[in-house]
Amino acid sequence: MANGHRSQIKRERNAVKDTRPSAKLSYARVSVQKACFVLDAIRGKSLDEALAIVMYNPRYASSIIEKLLKSAAANAENNNGMDPSKLYVEECYANKGPTMKRVHPRAQGRAYRIEKRMSHITVVLNER
């Protein structure tokens, strides 16, 4: 058990809280592997460059990540008072979410399983 009063513990926990602007999408209906193709392309890029990359990327995940980038940029501007022209993608990752299991009927009464995978996508921005 931690020593100290509950309010003191909360104060200490909030002191080390990450204040970088971010956006997170949970339960995105795209697999982690497919989302990572787009995320790898924008990692470390400036915000304008990252938005240009996802805008012209034909993958389905890029439309989801474009919304996330715009949301994180709005969070940076409105909540943190950061300049949008100085922002860059510091972190972006996709974690595994739950899997929906579906059945695909096959010949002679068999059934194959289809796994519809989900992911939790996070984008973290910062100022240069």
UniProtKB/Swiss-Prot annotation:
SUPFAM superfamilies: Ribosomal protein L22. Pfam families: Ribosomal_L22. The keyword Nucleotide-binding does not apply. Disulfide bonds: none annotated. Residues 9-20 have a biased composition (Basic and acidic residues). Keywords: Ribonucleoprotein, Ribosomal protein, RNA-binding, rRNA-binding. Part of the 50S ribosomal subunit. InterPro entries: Ribosomal_uL22 (IPR001063), Ribosomal_uL22_bac/chlpt-type (IPR005727), Ribosomal_uL22_bac/org-type (IPR047867), Ribosomal_uL22_CS (IPR018260), Ribosomal_uL22_sf (IPR036394). This is Large ribosomal subunit protein uL22. It comes from Lachnospira eligens (strain ATCC 27750 / DSM 3376 / VPI C15-48 / C15-B4) (Eubacterium eligens). Residues 1-20 are annotated as: Disordered. This protein binds specifically to 23S rRNA; its binding is stimulated by other ribosomal proteins, e.g. L4, L17, and L20. It is important during the early stages of 50S assembly. It makes multiple contacts with different domains of the 23S rRNA in the assembled 50S subunit and ribosome. The globular domain of the protein is located near the polypeptide exit tunnel on the outside of the subunit, while an extended beta-hairpin is found that lines the wall of the exit tunnel in the center of the 70S ribosome. GO terms for molecular function: rRNA binding; structural constituent of ribosome. Belongs to the universal ribosomal protein uL22 family. GO terms for cellular component: cytosolic large ribosomal subunit. CDD domains: Ribosomal_L22 (cd00336). One of its GO terms (biological process) is translation.
